[in-house]
Amino acid sequence: ALNSKKDLRVSLQEMQNRLENKIKMDFEVERMEPLFASEAEYYTFKERHDKHQVPVKDLSTYHGKVFLGIDAGSTTTKAALVGEDGTLLYSFYHNNDGDPLGTTIHAIKDIYRQLPEGVEIVHSCSTGYGEALIKSALMLDEGEVETVSHYYAAAFFDPEVDCILDIGGQDMKLSLIHI
């Protein structure tokens, strides 16, 4: 807005005065209660969630069909290959440095360098901030809304999941599930 005014001049003294005085901002922030009432409650939560682990196998010894998932987030890109039995065979996590497509291409090249004979990527899906870009640019089979992807993942571990908290690179989302 200031740039739209012609010939707006401010002396150095005036600029210093403006910078030294506190900026008054009038707004209200609605705050939530803490997620955990106590440290003990937090550790109980951690203990319960640590019981659910994704089984992991070595991609180099795997034979069969795999599924490729890509989460092109606003700050990081994640990729995974999952076997027919739900085991994690490959994972990739990297800051995308403002280039989710370039980072995803890097991940795909890494996958193909490691992909053994007898392994076939039969389905691919993207999600996240760059979901549509990645799906279109790399001609993936489908794209999925990030919150729906979170639900599928959470329901894999707990079919009765009723709350998902996503703390992402640029925002936070709380999903309450009612079925």
What do these predicted ranges mean?
Residues I177-I179:
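Conserved small/polar residues in nucleotide/adenosyl-binding loops
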